[in-house]
């Protein structure tokens, strides 16, 4: 049932759960199916698998739109009398003249000329949907895709991962051909060479960079040390010739973390609205939160990189963190920093945690329980602190609209070709216009929203 059906329940919470599962299932499949593809290609392929267009097409083939409850079930408004049938010639005539569905019931009460005149007026107002209101309903493509995700979510709840995978197979999604997770593709080694020297080199890196201490911090001992070496190797660390960098593991770990966190939020916040669930999930998996978790466990000292700019960014973030950075402080990432006063959150720290989660998952034989144990070790205190808070953290753009419900306006400005920056203009009632830039328009909008929140906070502190 859609939210518009005004029933006691709807699909939206299940949709959030199903969305995270399909993202995880497809990410694992692509990671194992294409061991030589880099993270960018895998992300593009995953987007094709899980897009609303794909889910809509699969749902339509299975006649799911016919099963959706999209309107209020009210006999006085849309009920049909027993034995009532619209004559085929009347239905064909109404369709030919493109009569909007909410006018069909009045056809017998007016003359043909009056009815056509009424239709013309409604068309001028943009009302053009024409269908039989007693035997058909109007459902958007996205609603069909959302329903498919909700069905995946309920399959997961009722029967677990295997049932959800079987449902994906029955839908026609080409991952594992509908077979079991346990019978899926083998896990490849992280080593780039099968020669004996490669194993020796991995152990040398393991000892040289004290990765045994990292294992102690995450409370997991790797059986295949090549996974932990890969998980800690930044793309700038060209000295490592035996494994790839962590980007592929980060792609997998991101999906696993999203799935595990969504499941935790779904089960522990039963009274949360779908919007609040999404806010919580976004808060737990965003780069700021992961960077805080990494610094709390001092994981940055195990990151292998050769990038002075990244070193400066990490040092600056650690300094701020040690000086008592508050969780509510607005922080800018490397991608959206606009001046020296903005605090940079090194994306590599969040990527490191995601790569470690992906590495643990593979090394443990694709055990979600082991991966969740590591998540709890790294982020358990952050999750516990958030649960104690009265207010649920939310996206900065949404938070801005919550604080100022009316009058806010975001305007895109022309792309700056000279420095490759996208720009957004933000207007808030009672404040001067703000112009902020970023590497793309999505980032620029977030930067502008964060700047607006800071101004509102300063205004409130001054008592205006």
Segments and roles (model prediction):
Residues 1-464:
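Double-stranded RNA-binding/processing signature
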């Amino acid at each position: 049932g859609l939210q518009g059906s005004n029933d006691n329940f709807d699909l939206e919470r299940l949709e959030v759960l199903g969305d995270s599962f399909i993202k995880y299932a497809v990410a694992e499949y692509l990671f194992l199916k294409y061991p030589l593809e880099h993270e960018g290609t895998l992300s593009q392929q995953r987007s094709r698998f899980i897009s609303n267009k794909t889910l809509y097409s699969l749902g339509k083939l299975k006649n799911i739109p016919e099963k959706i409850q999209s309107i209020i079930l009210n006999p006085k408004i849309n009920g049909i009398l027993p034995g009532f049938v619209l004559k085929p010639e009347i239905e064909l005539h109404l369709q030919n003249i493109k009569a909007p569905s909410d006018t069909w019931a009045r056809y017998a009460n007016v003359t043909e000329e009056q009815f056509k005149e009424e239709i013309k007026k409604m068309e001028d107002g943009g009302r053009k949907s024409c269908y039989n209101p007693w035997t058909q309903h109007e459902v958007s493509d996205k609603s069909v895709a959302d329903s498919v995700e909700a069905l995946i979510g309920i399959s997961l709840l009722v029967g677990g991962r295997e049932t959800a995978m079987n449902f994906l197979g029955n839908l026609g999604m080409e991952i594992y051909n509908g077979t079991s997770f346990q019978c899926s593709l083998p896990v490849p080694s992280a080593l780039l060479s099968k020669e004996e020297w490669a194993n020796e080199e991995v152990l040398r890196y393991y000892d040289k960079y004290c990765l045994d201490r990292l294992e102690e911090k995450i409370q997991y001992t790797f059986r295949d040390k090549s996974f932990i070496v890969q998980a800690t190797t930044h793309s700038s660390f060209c000295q490592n010739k035996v494994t790839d960098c962590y980007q592929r593991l980060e792609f997998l770990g991101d999906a696993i973390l999203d799935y595990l966190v969504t499941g935790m939020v779904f089960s522990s916040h039963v009274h949360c609205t779908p919007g609040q669930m999404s806010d919580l999930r976004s808060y737990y998996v965003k780069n700021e939160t992961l960077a805080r978790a990494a610094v709390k466990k001092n994981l940055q000292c195990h990151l292998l990189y050769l990038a002075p700019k990244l070193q400066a960014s990490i040092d600056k973030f650690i300094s701020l963190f040690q000086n008592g950075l508050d969780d509510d402080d607005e922080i800018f990432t490397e991608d959206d920093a606009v001046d020296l006063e903005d605090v940079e959150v090194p994306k590599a720290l969040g990527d490191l945690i995601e790569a470690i989660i992906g590495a643990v998952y593979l090394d443990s034989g694709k055990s979600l329980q082991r991966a969740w144990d590591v998540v709890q070790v790294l982020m358990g205190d952050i999750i516990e602190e958030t649960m104690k808070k009265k207010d649920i953290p939310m996206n900065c753009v949404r938070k801005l609209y919550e604080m100022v419900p009316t009058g806010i306006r975001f305007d895109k400005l022309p792309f700056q070709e000279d420095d490759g920056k996208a720009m957004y203009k933000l207007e808030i009632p009672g404040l001067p216009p703000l112009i902020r830039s970023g590497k793309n328009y999505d980032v620029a909008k977030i930067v502008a929203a964060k700047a607006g929140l800071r101004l509102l906070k300063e205004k409130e502190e001054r008592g205006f």
